[in-house]
Structure formats: structure tokens, C-alpha cells
Amino acid sequence: MKNKMQLQFTARSRNESFARVRVAAFVAQLDPTLDELTGNQTVVSEAVTNAIIHGYEENPDGMVYVSAAICDDGTVEITVRDEGKGIADIEEARQPSFTTKPELERAGMGFTIMENFMDDVEIQSQQESGTIIRLKKHLALKNALCN
């Protein structure tokens, strides 16, 4: 049985911190280490920021959907979805330093950062239909807080 949560919000940069904090609060029930918690916050920030900046090109009318689940074995699954313009070439986009917006700070590092913090990163995208990023990380269970 999975414990689940869902969020949806408009594609505004200020909502990135909202998503990050909500997912961190949800994952906190596993009593993660500070590194694990920070890693989860970082990947949510990167995925949501990608949806806002690249998916919707900062059009605040778009919606971003975030869900998180905690599996019985302690695996955390996070999904970030948008209905934006999609990614033309996923393999190219996953290359370190590849960017379509070189003028931005840290441009091109989003997927690399996600891959460094998570056990599994899956990206599905269709042009003009949006992108789904699925992130998985196994956290060690601490029995006192999981029951």
C-alpha cells in the first residue's frame, strides 16, 4: 500500500518553493537523513523549475502537477508533470550542460542534478503535449516513524 499526495498549481516561479516544502513535509514521515531530505527538495525544485521555464516558457497560465508516494519498502516516488511544449530530444536534454536557455544561471544542469540525487529518473515527453518526470529514491526505513 502506498501513501500518496498530490499538488497542482499555476506555472509561476514563486510556486516552486511551495512544491519543494510540501513534498519535503510528506517525505519527512520516513525520518530521512538531512542529505536525503535535501536531495528530494532539490530534485523537486529542478523538475518544477524545468516545467515552468522550459515547458511553459514562463507562461503563468499553465498548470504544474506534482505527486509523491511512499511505498512500503521506503521508496519515494515523485512525479512532476506539465502540459507545456515538450522536449524535442530527451537524450540530448539529459546531457550535462545542454540547454535551450544559455542565458540562465545553472542552465543545462537540471537533469544531471536529478540523476545525481535519485536512484531512477524517467522522462516522457511529447511535443506540444507536455512532459512527465518520474523520480525514485529508496530511503532506509526507520520503524518508529513508518507505522
From Swiss-Prot:
GO terms for biological process: asexual sporulation; negative regulation of sporulation resulting in formation of a cellular spore; sporulation resulting in formation of a cellular spore. The keyword Kinase applies. PANTHER family: ANTI-SIGMA-F FACTOR RSBW, ANTI-SIGMA-F FACTOR RSBW-RELATED. It comes from Heyndrickxia coagulans (Weizmannia coagulans). Its EC number is 2.7.11.1. Belongs to the anti-sigma-factor family. It catalyses: L-seryl-[protein] + ATP = O-phospho-L-seryl-[protein] + ADP + H(+); L-threonyl-[protein] + ATP = O-phospho-L-threonyl-[protein] + ADP + H(+). Keywords: ATP-binding, Kinase, Nucleotide-binding, Serine/threonine-protein kinase, Sporulation, Transferase. Binds to sigma F and blocks its ability to form an RNA polymerase holoenzyme (E-sigma F). Phosphorylates SpoIIAA on a serine residue. This phosphorylation may enable SpoIIAA to act as an anti-anti-sigma factor that counteracts SpoIIAB and thus releases sigma F from inhibition. The keyword Transcription does not apply. GO terms for molecular function: ATP binding; protein serine kinase activity; protein serine/threonine kinase activity; sigma factor antagonist activity. This is Anti-sigma F factor. NCBIfam families: spIIAB.
